[in-house]
Swiss-Prot record:
GO terms for biological process: defense response. Developing endosperm. Belongs to the plant thionin (TC 1.C.44) family. The gene is TTHV. The lineage of its organism: Eukaryota, Viridiplantae, Streptophyta, Embryophyta, Tracheophyta. This is Type-5 thionin. Is disulfide-linked.
Amino acid sequence: MGGGQKGLESAIVCLLVLGLVLEQVQVEGVDCGANPFKVACFNSCLLGPSTVFQCADFCACRLPAGLASVRSSDEPNAIEYCSLGCRSSVCDNMINTADNSTEEMKLYVKRCGVACDSFCKGDTLLASLDD
């Protein structure tokens, strides 16, 4: 198995892990109650460029205390530490387990970092492997 194939597999695993984490935030994190219109509003809002925070406010859904506290005055620090933790646990694992000398692998690691930044800022979109 070549280094490029191994890098691609690592990138896919990275995106799958981030997708699972994002799914947990969406399912367990935001409470729109039993109102199907609020749920539909929130889910359709997430399809656009809006953040979880913006969609929750717009659709009158409640964020849990832990997620809502990210919007406090320490938000830049919280985002920075979240991104740093994500990169060190997910993206660095890609570097350590694959041949990171290829240009393709460097691109995957960079996109993993972008995905971590998007996740930590509350965005629900992950970096695409297709540009």
